[in-house]
Amino acid sequence: MNFLLSWVHWSLALLLYLHHAKWSQAAPMAEGDQKPHEVVKFMDVYQRSYCRPIETLVDIFQEYPDEIEYIFKPSCVPLMRCGGCCNDEGLECVPTEEFNITMQIMRIKPHQGQHIGEMSFLQHNKCECRPKKDRARQENPCGPCSERRKHLFVQDPQTCKCSCKNTDSRCKARQLELNERTCRCDKPRR
């Protein structure tokens, strides 16, 4: 009887081991490489879902809400933005390092024409999980770049320095000059 129980115990252990070995052969999760019915390993899921810069399609009107007279092609742009999960509900995924990237976008003004122009967008370079309440405290000491047209500015959260989303070359392409105080493209002074 002991032999029979021992044999059943070892047989079940072997079956469990073989079953686990079969399912743990799943390849690491890579975009497009995932096969149906494969089990993705915990560490692969964890690494891909944790707070990090990830390519995100951002609607241009979300970044430039006042430019309603144009139709943009493409209407959204791929930007690296912070996304993902933090291990605690009291934390959120926030950018700790940002920079501007300039892209060529077709700007169409209905019944007037179109041109390819440069537009500047904010990209996230590094992200961290930080306490939600600390983020509000961290942003407040800087104060706003401008009371009006805040969307025209980007602010470095560490130095509080404000810079323009518009670029000088973008303004010059429209025969205008960049006004660094207002971050708008103005007519040249004579």
From Swiss-Prot:
Its main location: secreted. SMART domains: PDGF. GO terms for biological process: angiogenesis; cell migration involved in sprouting angiogenesis; cellular response to hypoxia; endothelial cell chemotaxis; induction of positive chemotaxis; macrophage differentiation; monocyte differentiation; motor neuron migration. It is found in: Secreted. Residues 1-26 form the signal peptide. Glycans are attached at residue 100. PANTHER family: VASCULAR ENDOTHELIAL GROWTH FACTOR, VASCULAR ENDOTHELIAL GROWTH FACTOR A, LONG FORM. Belongs to the PDGF/VEGF growth factor family. This is Vascular endothelial growth factor A. It comes from Sus scrofa. The gene is VEGFA.
